[in-house]
Each structure stands twice: as structure tokens, then as C-alpha cells.
């Protein structure tokens, strides 16, 4: 049952075949057995069992709260949760307990969701591997799949403490790992430049970044206010659509959310692509793109065309400038947002108290890692009086040009864009950490950050396995607030790929995980 989709599990609960407490206990057991993956920072066992028991009572009375009632979920540890520690994987917030729930968290609780725990991430969401956390890196569960183990150059099977495991992606790596490993049916991540879609692609799950303003950011500890958006990680596109319907809508606590009411939708079972135009951006043939991703991208475009969709090459001419533009704007907002962590009101406070200035400096030196401090320094540099026009203002203008590129393409009749999500499959951890964080992020975010700067919806769908037996994802980008159309196309492609999730098998020992995949989800 742990390999089911959210909607399948919900149906089993409604039929009374399994009780929410039984399902909760199964997930908690699996979390403990796969603890070496380091997906969770905090496991909320007592809270989960209490919430599941309450769901038991509602089902016994025939009054479930909704489709999420009794369903195990996980929340990225940069969302505020009342009474539960929210650390952002940083010493700066270790021990911090928020007095309120983030809006998305509260909406899930209102639907009866059962919280398994808070998931691991790069410190404050600044990274693309989930390797820069004070709680240690997240391991991709596919590191322990038969498909990967059998393709390794070494002959022996992996142990939990070996060095051959691959990264989960980031910064929402813990959330992607939790869903992929079967410890929950839904995880919430955040997406500033690809932080939901990148790990979803590497872990073989669906990752949805909604249109900016469609889902409330209230309670999401901010990184880049103008780009941050809660992300949804599930095992299938239908589940992502279901959850979006629960989370979307105006929030009085977030003035950037749209005023118009959101109409939840379900995706059709029979999908007709004959009236759709799919765009293939030529600028996304980026340096470093693996031949496997390129082949998968091309094959998927052919499948869409054979199904009746019009497929055409399009141009987004300012794409080559986007990653530099993103870096300038991202670090500038980071510098502003991180100023609130000064040791005065909450979070870590240094013992050095010779003066307020000394305490403030020591607190930030002790509380932030090198990556966070580096981004703060970069952002403050771009915001200096002598640099403001030269860098920050110019980057804002380029951002507008990037957004206009998308507007022109969509106004030309294109409905959805098909692109890679990442340059390749997940890198081995020891190889990944050889590069500095900024270089890694530039490489990993190259296909994803444009949609954050343009505020557009995007979803990554698992599309196949690499020659190393690791997941490869493809990204679909839609028009603003056209999530239904976007997810309909994504669901059609998902059906063609028939990608199967990982299934945990205790018989193999060492926390091994085996993959049961169908013929169409084989190696590219």
C-alpha cells in the first residue's frame, strides 16, 4: 500500500480496508527503516498518531474531512508549524518553534492530513543538492535501487555507509526523498529557482511549481519574496492536481495571492491533444545537456506530435542571460531577508556580548554556513549605491525581458512548453561536493529558474531511467494560471511513460529498495 498514489490510498481508507492509524504506523516504521536516507529532520510520531486516531473516529462516523483525511504527509522544514521546531536546516533557527502554522500547512490539516515530520533541505533553501544542511545531506533512495546497484562499476551491493550514493537534488531534497521512498504520499516543498522540480526529477516523482500568487507564501520562511512559491511533490500528476485544489486561493495573510477564487479541477482520463500546440525552446539545448536527456526530450516531442499535437520550435532569446540575472536578484533579496536573523528576537544568539554590534556579527557568523554568508555578501555588493543601477536595476530589466519572451511565445498560439528539467541524472555525492555551491546551483537551475522569474507554472514528470538506472525528468511550462491545461498535458505524457515508483523490500536487508518498472519506463 505504501507504493500507492495518494488518491488510491484515500480510496482504500474510505472503503475501510485499512485504518488511518494502521497506515500511519506503516509509514512511521518505514521512516525508521530508511533513516539512513536522512530525509527527515524532525519525525512527529506522537502528533501523527494523534491525528491518525482522530481520523479513525471520523471514518467510523462516516464523516471524513476530505480526500486527504488520514493520509500521511511531510512538510519541508522552512514552513512554520505551530508547536513543532522549524529550523531551515540551519544553526540559526535550531530550536525555533513557530507560534502558528503556515497557510498551506493549516489547509492540509483542515483536510485531515497526518503529519509524519519536517523534511531536510539545504540551509535556508540555498542549494540544489540538499547537501548543505547542519543535519547532514539527504541520500537519494534510488542509490539503493536494483537498477542503480546493478549498473555500478563496482560489483558488491551497497551498504548504508558506502560512498557511492547519489544526491537527492535540492533544495527540497528531503521532501522528494520522502515521497520517493514511500514514507508519505504528499510532501510540500518550496520553489525559488527550481527547488521542487530539481529534486523531484532526481528522485523520480512529480514536482509542481504553481503560478506565482496562486498559493499562499504565508508561513514560508522567505528566501526570495518575488520568486518563492510552495511546491507540491507527489507520485503522480493526478495527485498534484488534487492537492493544488486544496491549497490554491486568496489568503488574507499574503497580499501577493490573487483575489479571484480558484476552482479545483480533476484531470480527464481520456486526453485529446489535437487542439494543442507544444513549444520546444531552442535555447534549452544548453551546454552540458546529457545525450540521454536530449534523446528523451526528442522522443517525447515525437510522441506528442504523433498523438495529434502541433509541435514547433520556439525561441526564448533572453534565456542565456537568465541564470546570471537570477543570481543577482536572488542574492539581493537574500541579503535583505537574512537581515532579520540578528539574535535579538528569535533563533541563535551568540555568547559574545561586548556590544550589540559584536553580538550581532558573532550571531550571524556562528548561525549561518559559508553558503548563506556568501550569498548575503554578494547581495549586499549588488545593492551598494555605486552598484545598484549597474547590477540590480539592470537585472530587473532583464527579468522583464525574460518574462516578455514567454508572453510572446504563448501569445503566438503555443499552449505548453516542453523542456528538460535538469542537465542529467543525479550526481554521486562525492563528485557533487567537489564544486562550489554557486557553480552547482547555476548548473542545476539552468532550466528551472526562468519560470520563477516569469511567475509561470511548471511541472516535472519522471520520464525514464538513465543508463546508470537513475530517474530522468522532463519539464512542462504553462501559461500563467493555466494549471489545468498544463497538468493535462503532463498527465498524458505520464501515461505514455508508465513510470513505476520505488517499492521497499525488507527481504534484501541493509535498507535496500527495489524498483519495479514497466517496459516503457526502461532505460533511454
From Swiss-Prot:
Give the record's keywords alphabetically. ATP-binding, Ligase, Mitochondrion, Nucleotide-binding, Protein biosynthesis
User: What is the active site of this protein?
Assistant: 76 (charge relay system), 171 (charge relay system), 195 (acyl-ester intermediate)
* Catalytic activity, reaction form: L-glutamyl-tRNA(Gln) + L-glutamine + ATP + H2O = L-glutaminyl-tRNA(Gln) + L-glutamate + ADP + phosphate + H(+)
Q: Where found in the cell? A: Mitochondrion
Annotated signal sequence is: none
| GO CC annotations on file | glutamyl-tRNA(Gln) amidotransferase complex; mitochondrion
User: Does the keyword section mention Mitochondrion?
Assistant: yes
GO BP: glutaminyl-tRNAGln biosynthesis via transamidation; mitochondrial translation
The principal location of this protein is: mitochondrion
One molecular function GO term is:
glutaminyl-tRNA synthase (glutamine-hydrolyzing) activity
Which EC numbers characterise this protein's activity in its record?
A: 6.3.5.7
Is Protein biosynthesis there in the keyword field? yes
Q: What class of enzyme is it?
A: ligase
Describe its partners and assembly state: Subunit of the heterotrimeric GatCAB amidotransferase (AdT) complex, composed of A (qrsl1), B (gatb) and C (gatc) subunits.
The family database entries (HAMAP family) matched by this protein are listed as:
GatA
Family membership: Belongs to the amidase family. GatA subfamily.
Function noted in UniProt? Allows the formation of correctly charged Gln-tRNA(Gln) through the transamidation of misacylated Glu-tRNA(Gln) in the mitochondria. The reaction takes place in the presence of glutamine and ATP through an activated gamma-phospho-Glu-tRNA(Gln).
Name of the protein in question: Glutamyl-tRNA(Gln) amidotransferase subunit A, mitochondrial
What is the protein's species of origin?
Xenopus laevis (African clawed frog)
Amino acid at each position: 500500500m505504501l507504493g500507492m498514489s495518494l488518491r488510491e490510498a484515500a480510496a482504500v481508507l474510505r472503503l475501510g480496508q485499512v485504518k488511518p492509524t494502521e497506515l500511519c504506523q506503516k509509514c512511521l516504521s518505514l521512516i525508521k527503516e530508511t533513516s539512513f536516507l536522512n530525509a527527515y529532520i524532525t519525525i512527529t510520531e506522537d502528533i501523527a498518531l494523534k491525528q491518525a486516531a482522530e481520523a479513525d473516529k471520523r471514518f467510523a462516523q462516516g464523516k471524513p474531512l476530505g480526500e486527504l483525511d488520514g493520509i500521511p504527509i511531510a512538510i519541508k522544514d522552512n514552513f512554520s508549524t505551530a508547536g513543532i521546531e522549524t529550523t531551515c536546516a540551519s544553526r540559526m533557527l535550531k530550536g525555533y518553534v513557530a507560534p502558528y502554522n503556515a497557510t498551506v500547512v493549516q489547509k492540509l490539516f483542515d483536510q485531515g492530513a497526518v503529519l509524519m515530520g519536517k523534511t531536510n533541505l539545504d540551509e535556508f533553501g540555498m542549494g540544489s543538492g540538499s547537501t548543505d544542511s547542519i543535519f547532514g545531506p539527504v541520500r537519494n533512495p534510488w542509490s539503493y535501487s536494483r537498477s542503480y546497484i546493478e549498473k555500478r562499476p563496482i560489483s558488491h551491493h551497497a551498504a548504508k555507509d558506502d560512498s557511492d550514493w547519489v544526491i537527492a537534488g535540492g533544495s527540497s531534497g528531503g521532501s522528494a526523498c520522502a515521497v520517493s521512498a514511500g514514507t508519505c504520499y504528499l510532501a510540500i516543498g518550496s520553489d525559488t529557482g527550481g527547488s521542487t522540480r530539481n529534486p523531484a526529477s532526481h528522485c523520480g516523482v512529480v514536482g509542481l511549481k504553481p503560478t506565482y500568487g496562486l498559493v499562499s507564501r504565508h508561513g514560508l520562511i522567505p528566501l526570495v519574496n518575488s520568486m518563492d512559491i510552495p511546491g507540491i511533490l507527489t507520485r503522480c500528476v493526478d495527485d498534484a492536481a488534487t492537492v493544488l485544489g486544496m491549497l490554491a486561493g486568496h489568503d488574507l495573510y499574503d497580499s501577493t495571492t490573487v483575489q479571484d477564487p480558484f476552482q479545483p479541477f480533476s484531470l480527464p482520463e481520456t486526453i485529446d491533444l489535437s487542439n494543442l500546440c507544444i513549444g520546444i525552446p531552442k535555447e534549452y539545448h544548453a551546454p552540458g545537456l546529457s545525450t540521454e536527456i536530449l534523446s528523451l526530450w526528442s522522443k517525447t516531442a515525437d510522441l506528442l506530435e504523433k498523438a495529434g499535437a502541433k509541435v514547433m520550435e520556439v525561441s526564448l532569446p533572453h534565456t542565456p542571460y537568465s541564470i546570471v540575472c537570477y543570481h543577482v536578484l536572488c542574492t539581493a533579496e537574500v541579503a535583505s531577508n537574512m537581515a532579520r536573523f540578528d539574535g535579538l528576537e528569535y533563533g541563535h544568539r551568540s555568547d559574545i556580548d561586548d556590544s550589540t554590534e559584536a553580538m550581532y556579527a558573532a550571531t550571524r557568523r556562528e548561525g549561518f554556513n559559508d553558503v548563506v554568508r556568501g550569498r548575503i555578501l554578494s547581495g549586499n555588493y549588488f545593492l551598494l549605491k555605486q552598484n545598484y543601477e549597474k547590477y540590480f536595476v539592470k537585472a530587473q530589466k532583464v527579468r522583464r525581458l525574460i518574462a516578455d519572451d514567454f508572453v510572446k511565445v504563448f501569445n503566438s498560439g503555443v499552449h505548453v512548453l516542453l523542456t528538460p528539467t535538469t542537465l542529467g541524472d543525479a550526481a554521486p555525492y562525492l563528485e557533487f561536493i567537489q564544486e562550489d555551491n554557486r557553480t552547482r546551483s547555476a548548473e542545476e537551475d539552468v532550466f528551472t529558474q526562468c519560470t520563477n522569474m516569469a511567475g509561470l507554472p511548471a511541472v516535472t514528470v519522471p520520464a525514464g531511467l538513465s543508463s546508470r538506472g537513475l530517474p530522468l525528468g522532463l519539464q512542462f511550462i504553462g501559461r500563467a494560471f493555466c494549471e489545468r491545461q498544463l497538468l493535462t498535458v503532463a498527465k498524458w505524457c505520464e501515461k505514455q511513460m508508465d513510470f513505476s515508483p520505488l517499492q521497499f523490500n525488507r527481504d534484501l536487508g541493509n535498507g535496500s529498495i527495489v524498483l519495479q518498472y514497466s517496459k516503457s519506463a526502461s532505460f533511454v
